[in-house]
Amino acid sequence: MAGARGYHTYRGRTPKGKIALAVVLVLIILASAVFIFIQQFVVYDASGTPHLQLPGSQTQQEEPEPDETEDVELTIDTPALTGVKLHALAQAPLTAADAQAALTAGGDGVVVTLKDSEGYVYYDSAMPQASASIQTQADTAAALSTLTGSEDCYTVARISCLLDPRAARADVEGMGLKNTGGYIFYDGNNLNWLDPSKSGTQEYLGGLVKECASMGFDEILLTDVSFPTEGKLNKIAYPGAGMQESIRAFLMAMDTALAAYPDVKLSVELPESVITLGQDETAGLVLSEIAPLVDRIYTETTEGSIPALEAAVEAVGEDTVLIPELTAIPAESDQPYLLTEPS
């Protein structure tokens, strides 16, 4: 049916307020889009203040890298050896009273004999070669722990090496220094020695060195490292490798024994004449071959001889230190020394 003539559907008029509202909404949407877009160009400085940085306007500043603290190498030094008194305890099994006396006697350290030139061992060694030669007191182990456990006391274990009548006679084939007849050699004092070239000698003494290091001693001082110099020396059956090479190989074996204890120093005691003359052919000692193998060289001397001895050692062992053994405190006592008698 057709609509009424002259009439159409009335839709009303569009108010101007609605148009304005639509425009505002469009502007808000555009503003939001622009805000979101430029967010990617907002940067913040070190203080947290925002800045607008458009593409191509300037090179983006690199963030400052945090300061890196320079690596510092920490070195822990053991107490300096500036005066060590040898007490009577050094030639006998250590007791608790001896240890306490040593700690209060002054100086910075103590030298304790753990094996003497008669072959006696003054601690409970696990080495089977020492089993018949051990001499201790009930409190020796505790006394040794007292010394090595003191942070203010530099401890040196003194070991007599090749002059050892007990071990030499107990195992002539494995360790003893023989005469040309195949029997144990007796020197001018009717004493017996170990052969430094024999593996049994190196194993035994190397084991003692390792045990002393494991007990906490800061340094191992080897004494009586030489061939005999008294008696019928022409009757000695010297090692085929030669005397000097045998001594050198022995010291290298002792150094190897300390491989697990890199902070423990290895030292040797030499006669003053070996340092001043450079060698002793009779004893098989050559300073230039010995000095590079040890950290310190001890020698009995007087204060006036120290400068010349230091120069001689330094000339053949750049890092080797001379430790003079004195009977009185020197006038210049800022250098290391060993006091062998109470002043």
What are these regions (language model features)?
Residues 1-19:
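N-terminal Lys/Arg-rich, disordered targeting/topogenic segments
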Residues 100, 116-160, 208, 230-266:
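Aromatic-lined substrate-binding rim segments of carbohydrate-active enzymes
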Residues 87, 154-163, 221-222, 243-284, ...:
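Aromatic-lined carbohydrate-recognition surfaces of secreted/lumenal glycan-active proteins
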Residues 76-89, 162-210:
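Active-site-adjacent "subsite" loops/lids of carbohydrate-active enzymes
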Residues 95-121, 211-221, 290-298:
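Catalytic domains of carbohydrate-active enzymes, especially glycoside hydrolases
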Residues 41-83:
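N-terminal, intrinsically disordered, polar/charged segments of Gram-positive cell-envelope systems
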Residues 39-46, 294-343:
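Substrate-binding cleft of secreted/luminal carbohydrate-active enzymes
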Residues 21-37:
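Hydrophobic membrane-insertion alpha-helices, especially the h-region
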